[in-house]
Amino acid sequence: MSDIRHSLLRRDALSAAKEVLYHLDIYFSSQLQSAPLPIVDKGPVELLEEFVFQVPKERSAQPKRLNSLQELQLLEIMCNYFQEQTKDSVRQIIFSSLFSPQGNKADDSRMSLLGKLVSMAVAVCRIPVLECAASWLQRTPVVYCVRLAKALVDDYCCLVPGSIQTLKQIFSASPRFCCQFITSVTALYDLSSDDLIPPMDLLEMIVTWIFEDPRLILITFLNTPIAANLPIGFLELTPLVGLIRWCVKAPLAYKRKKKPPLSNGHVSNKVTKDPGVGMDRDSHLLYSKLHLSVLQVLMTLQLHLTEKNLYGRLGLILFDHMVPLVEEINRLADELNPLNASQEIELSLDRLAQALQVAMASGALLCTRDDLRTLCSRLPHNNLLQLVISGPVQQSPHAALPPGFYPHIHTPPLGYGAVPAHPAAHPALPTHPGHTFISGVTFPFRPIR
C-alpha cells in the first residue's frame, strides 16, 4: 500500500481518487478469490480517507478541500465506477471500505459525500449504488442511517419543490433500498415534536409505495439470513415498529400541532393560520391507508415466520419498543385533554389495539396478556383496547353442561380430570301409544296478532 500511496501523491485530487478506486478494485478482487469475506484492514481505508475524502495522513497538515465542480466530478467518478463494476461482491466491499464509519475525524466528510452520492444515484437512477446503500443501511448503526435519510429528505422534499417525484420513481428500480429508506425515515421522524412530523410529500410517497405493494416493507426480512438475536443499535429488520408509531401517534401529534397559542395563561380566541391545518383531512386519509396496509402485512407474518423456522422465536415487533410508544400516547393524551381531543385519543387507542391484537395473533409480537395489562393500565379507557388486553372470554361452567365440556374458542380447554363427557345412559322411558292419523280433519288457522 505504501508504493501505491507514493504514486498517488504525484497526482491531482481527481485522478488520485480515480486511481485509488482502480487499485483497490484489483486488490479486493484478488482477495475475494481466496476468501469469500475478506477483512478490510487499515491500509485501504487510510488510502481512501486521504485521496477520496481529502483527510491528510499527517496530523499537522491542513486538510484539502475540493471546490463544488471538483466534488461533482468526484461523485460522477464514483457513480461510474459502481455502475461499471459487474461483480456485486467487489462493489459491496469497496462501498463498505469507503463509507463504513471509523469513529475518526474523516466520518463527517464520509457521511457528507455518501449523502451526495446516494442523492445523485437517485437522480440518475444508478441501481448498483442504491443496492450498495441498502446493504450499508442494514449493517450500519442507526445514528448514521438517519443522517443519510435526513440528507435525502432535505434534497428531495425541502430543497426543490416537486423533486419528490424523482425519489418516488426508485420504487421499481430498487425496492430493497426503498425498504431500508422507509425504516430509516421512521426512525428519524418519530413524531415526538412538531419538527419530527414527516413532511407531507414524504408521507404521501411512502403511503403510495406501501399501499401499492405492502410486501415492500418485508423485503429485507425475507431476503436476509436471520439469527434469533438481533444486534442492538442498528435498524430494525422491517419498518413495522416505526410505521405503527406513525399511525398510532399521528392523531395526537397533529392535534398538538394545531394547539392554539396561550395569551396570559388563557387560550387565544384568534384563529391562527397554520399551514398544517389545511392538510388535516389529507393526512388523516393517508394515515388510515397506511394503518390498513400495516395490518395487512402483519396478517401475513405468521406464514413467513414459520417458513423461516422463527415463529415463536423472533419478535419482529419487540415488546420493549411498545413500552415507550404507550408512554408517549399517555403523555400526549394528558397534554391534549383540555383541548377536547376525545376523538383523536379514541382513534389513537383503536389503532394501537388493532396493531397489538394482529401482531400477537401473527407471532410478530411475543408477549402475554398480563404484560399488555400492565403496559396499558395507565392509558385512557378504550373499549377495543380492553377487549384486546382481556383476551378471549372464558365462560363459567353452566349447570346444564357436563363437567367435562368446555366451549373454548381461542384458548385451550381447562385441564379437568378424567370425567366422562356424558353420564351413563338412563333407563328407557315407557312408550306412549301412537296417535291415529285421521284424514280430512281441518285445523283452524288464526294469524298471530
From Swiss-Prot:
Pfam families: INTS15. Component of the Integrator complex, composed of core subunits INTS1, INTS2, INTS3, INTS4, INTS5, INTS6, INTS7, INTS8, INTS9/RC74, INTS10, INTS11/CPSF3L, INTS12, INTS13, INTS14 and INTS15. The core complex associates with protein phosphatase 2A subunits PPP2CA and PPP2R1A, to form the Integrator-PP2A (INTAC) complex. INTS15 is part of the tail subcomplex, composed of INTS10, INTS13, INTS14 and INTS15. The keyword Disulfide bond does not apply. Keywords: Chromosome, Nucleus. Component of the integrator complex, a multiprotein complex that terminates RNA polymerase II (Pol II) transcription in the promoter-proximal region of genes. The gene is INTS15. The keyword Nucleus applies. This is Integrator complex subunit 15. It comes from Homo sapiens (Human). InterPro entries: INTS15. GO terms for cellular component: chromosome; INTAC complex; integrator complex; nucleus. GO terms for biological process: brain development; eye development; mRNA splicing, via spliceosome; RNA polymerase II transcription initiation surveillance. It is found in: Nucleus; Chromosome. Belongs to the Integrator subunit 15 family.
